[in-house]
């Protein structure tokens, strides 16, 4: 199979925070945020690979910097920033109500698997374009050694 080189492009998903998404403090429950976070990262990878062949390996450093409350619209911006032989890493940046400051950010490593759920090559190569892309590429690459 031929290798496909991609440039990181952003995939956006949005969520409305509702009362059932809140914790006992009245802020967005971390578990719900993690669910949406993984889903957003998965969608970025699934735009490149068959979703049937993608599994989540690890969430790296999902850092919360601000809370969200009922009625907030939360935006998940995801992009594939690194690809190994069988692994592929998404970076997810979360903000609310159009604010510039991050609500949550982090990386997720996914693995490309065959029909027997064994890791197999995906033949994707990531070519960073911007300084931010290069920084995210190197950061994601270094996650492999941790």
Language-model features: locations:
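N-terminal "first-domain core" detector
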Residues: 4-43
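HotDog/MaoC-like acyl-thioester-processing domains
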Residues: 7, 11-13, 69-70, 81-146
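Hydrophobic beta-strand-centered segment that forms part of the acyl-chain substrate-binding groove
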Residues: 8, 28, 42-77, 81-89, ...
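Basic side chains
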Residues: 15-18, 32, 58, 134, ...
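Hydrophobic residues in beta-strands and at strand termini
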Residues: 17-18, 64, 110
